[in-house]
A protein has these predicted regions:
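Alpha/beta-hydrolase superfamily serine-hydrolase fold, recognizing
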Residues: 1-291
């Protein structure tokens, strides 16, 4: 078959260990720095932006949203929904508001989604939770100017799974106009053979059922615009996954752009969304302004 299937176990582990590929910091240090940067950015956002925190979209302890609101009182703003990474087993919405200030200042509401991470959460449940959060937002803000998904790493996987949702079973259809998928994993099968699955305990069936690469639907007439972004210093496997998922969407008729972001690694590619002038911040604002 070639590719990841032919890699020795140790090499595959390395490919799916994003912290080993950062030229800025050591493996452990870059993860701690990422948690610190996103937590501090979220604290700054909560201090400077009007918020509705811990809004429940379901009965579960983690089924809550943090909403960062622009000044528009009519609720006709566009909504960016941010889905955090952490390999489906760490981080939370409480480190996920760092991108709010530059977007809210331009009239965009930002929503950070909480979901049950492993080992409490399993993959099917996480996907359902994120989908339910979108249905909840569609009902809460029926007059919004569209929903834009933004997911990082495991969150990009969950955002990609949202794109293949049959909304009939969720009671509401969100008006998803765009998706920004940052340094994601779109085929879960290689993950089965790495340390990442120790906490997830996925079977091959679960991995296949929840792999966006295997769930690419033909684009609807009003299909949203998708940006697949990857870091210069992501691993070759992460870069391959982004490339192949973008190509699969394009082959199915979706409007897709691929962005290779220079000078960043798997972590600061998303951390820099706290900056007004950062390329991805500008891409998101441009996507929203075109809709």
């Amino acid at each position: 078959m070639g590719g990841w299937r032919d890699m020795p176990a140790e090499a595959l582990e390395e490919q799916y260990s994003p912290s080993r590929w950062s030229p800025r910091l050591g493996s452990d240090t870059v993860i701690q720095a990422h948690i610190a940067a996103t937590a501090a950015g979220t604290e700054r956002a909560r201090a400077s932006v009007r918020t509705s925190l811990h809004v429940p979209y379901g009965p579960g302890e983690r089924e809550k949203l943090d909403i960062y609101l622009p000044t528009d009182p009519a609720g006709t703003f566009p909504v960016l929904v941010y889905i955090h990474g952490g390999y489906w087993q760490c981080l939370s919405k409480d480190e996920s508001g760092f991108a709010a200030p530059p977007l809210v200042s331009q009239g965009v509401a930002v929503v950070a989604v909480g979901y049950d991470t492993a080992p409490k959460g399993h993959m099917d449940a996480m996907v359902r939770q994120v989908r339910r959060s979108l249905a909840f937002l569609a009902q809460r803000y029926p007059g919004s100017r569209g929903v834009y998904l933004c997911g990082h790493s495991a969150g990009a996987h969950l955002a990609a799974m949202v794109l293949s949702t049959d909304w009939a079973e969720y009671g509401a259809v969100p008006d998803i106009k765009g998706a920004v998928l940052v340094s994601g994993v779109y085929d879960l099968e290689p993950i089965l053979h790495t340390y990442v699955n120790d906490a997830l305990s996925m079977s091959r069936e679960v991995a296949q059922r929840n792999s966006p690469m295997l769930r690419v639907a033909p684009a609807a007439a009003a299909a949203c615009e998708v940006l697949v972004a990857v870091a210069q210093h992501d691993s070759p496997e992460f870069r391959r996954q982004s490339q192949e998922y973008g190509e699969a969407l394009r082959a199915a008729g979706w409007s897709v752009s691929l962005l290779d972001v220079a000078g960043v690694d798997h972590f600061d590619i998303i951390e820099k969304l706290s900056e007004d002038t950062y390329v991805l911040t500008q891409v998101i604002l441009n996507m929203i302004s075109r809709a």
